[in-house]
Amino acid sequence: MSRYTLAIVGCGVMGQALLSAIYNAPKASDEALQYYPSKIIACNDVPASAELVEKLVSGFETSPNGIEVEIATNDNERAVAEAKVIILGLKPHIVEPVLQQIPNEDGSKLLISLAAGVTLNQLSQYYKKVSRVMTNTPAKYGYGTAIVSHSTSVEPQDKAIVSELVSQVGKCLELPEKNMDAATALVGSGPAFVLLMLESMMEAGLKMGIPLKESRECAMKVLEGTAKMVEISGQSPGVLKHQVCTPGGTTIAGLCVMEDKGVKSGIIRGIEEAARVSKELGQKK
């Protein structure tokens, strides 16, 4: 397979994260290089957004995999005509109007959609080969999580392209589409929920007299270290949580207050509500 052109239509926050990750990916092996584009066209309809992309790209060094970047404004149709793979980084409510303007005449192009709630069935009305990807803002720094679902028309070679591109932002997992709204809530919205916890821990330290800088550092390291402990130990969070508690100690006292305030149920309900809204987004025209 020869290398190809990738068009990112709607190069906003997540589009820019993927642009940066793909462009700056470490040198690929000769076998893997075929899955990387030789050129990326970053498309935006708003000049201000195009300027942000231009500013981002101006800070790039030479791509380890020889990728070129072109920035386009109000030129989706031409960019898509040139591309073999299209990443759709649009808001859900404008996905279908834009797809109507960029037809896939021969059915050969691969469409990768980042839009929450817009189903494979909806997207397949315009493109035969479709993959849905839900990632999150840590992807901008290479620590993202990406959930992928494919339509039945996506071939193994196409799946390899999606996996290679998306894995550059962090961890890539494949799930059935029925899980995508839940993944949108857990993965896509998840950083905001974790940041609320981080902010609360920082402010608790500050309230008790720890300087803000040190409170921030402590809270970040506690979250980072705890996640790593769960990963390395292989034990459930519940088991590890009880290992921290001692009879009559500080930890169990704090946990009891949090249970009284509904912290755990609030987190679960918040994620469920985010999933419900994700499902609704794809139904709005």
From Swiss-Prot:
Pfam families tied to this protein: F420_oxidored (PF03807), P5CR_dimer (PF14748)
Domain of life the protein comes from: Eukaryota
Molecular function per GO: pyrroline-5-carboxylate reductase activity
Pathway the protein acts in: Amino-acid biosynthesis; L-proline biosynthesis; L-proline from L-glutamate 5-semialdehyde: step 1/1
Keywords: Amino-acid biosynthesis, NADP, Oxidoreductase, Proline biosynthesis
Gene Ontology BP terms: L-proline biosynthetic process
Enzyme Commission code(s) on record: 1.5.1.2
Gene3D superfamilies reported in the protein's UniProt record: NAD(P)-binding Rossmann-like Domain (3.40.50.720), ProC C-terminal domain-like (1.10.3730.10)
Catalytic reaction(s) noted: L-proline + NADP(+) = (S)-1-pyrroline-5-carboxylate + NADPH + 2 H(+); L-proline + NAD(+) = (S)-1-pyrroline-5-carboxylate + NADH + 2 H(+)
Subunit relationships: Homotetramer.
Family: Belongs to the pyrroline-5-carboxylate reductase family.
Entries under PANTHER family matching the protein: PYRROLINE-5-CARBOXYLATE REDUCTASE (PTHR11645), PYRROLINE-5-CARBOXYLATE REDUCTASE 3 (PTHR11645:SF0)
Name this polypeptide is given: Pyrroline-5-carboxylate reductase
UniProt organism field: Kluyveromyces lactis (strain ATCC 8585 / CBS 2359 / DSM 70799 / NBRC 1267 / NRRL Y-1140 / WM37) (Yeast)
Phylogenetic classification of the source organism: Eukaryota, Fungi, Dikarya, Ascomycota, Saccharomycotina
